[in-house]
Amino acid sequence: MIRKSKKITKLRGSRTCGYGAAKKHRGAGHKGGKGLAGVTKHRWIHTVKYMPDHIGKYGFKRHSSLIKELKVINLGQLDEIVSKNKESFEIVDGKIVIDITTLDYEKVLGKGKITCPMIIKAVEFSESAKEKIESAGGEFVEL
């Protein structure tokens, strides 16, 4: 078996151990910076190959004052709540009256089916929810 001596043992005693001038082996400056410093300057091949999405701007952030985050409930969920607790809701002209805001919701979405006519009061309704409520013989009231 061949035993090859390590390069560093050969270089011991030579003051700079193969790094040229002593100042070239100091700090990160000689290496081109720490971390991701210089990825658009002198580490370009690595950037293009391994981090192609790292450079450039993508999309935008909407201003927080423009974003409306409403708590939503689907018609199917609402129908389940009503069918379990019919006694707790008011009935007017054979229609169950529900105020969504008392249930801590603000918007009604149209997923699911309604089995009985209802008068639903909410801040907002989706178009499909409006159609389904009316087709079931109910009404919607926007607050």
Curated annotation (Swiss-Prot):
Top-rank taxon of the source lineage equals: Archaea
**TM ranges:** none
Classification via PROSITE patterns: RIBOSOMAL_L15
- Its protein name is Large ribosomal subunit protein uL15
Which InterPro entries does the entry mention? Rbsml_uL15_N, Ribosomal_uL15, Ribosomal_uL15/eL18, Ribosomal_uL15/eL18_sf, Ribosomal_uL15_CS
GO BP term, pick one: translation
Tell me what organism the protein belongs to.
Methanococcus aeolicus (strain ATCC BAA-1280 / DSM 17508 / OCM 812 / Nankai-3)
Q: What Pfam families has UniProt attached to this entry?
A: Ribosomal_L27A
Family label: Belongs to the universal ribosomal protein uL15 family.
Quaternary structure, from the entry: Part of the 50S ribosomal subunit.
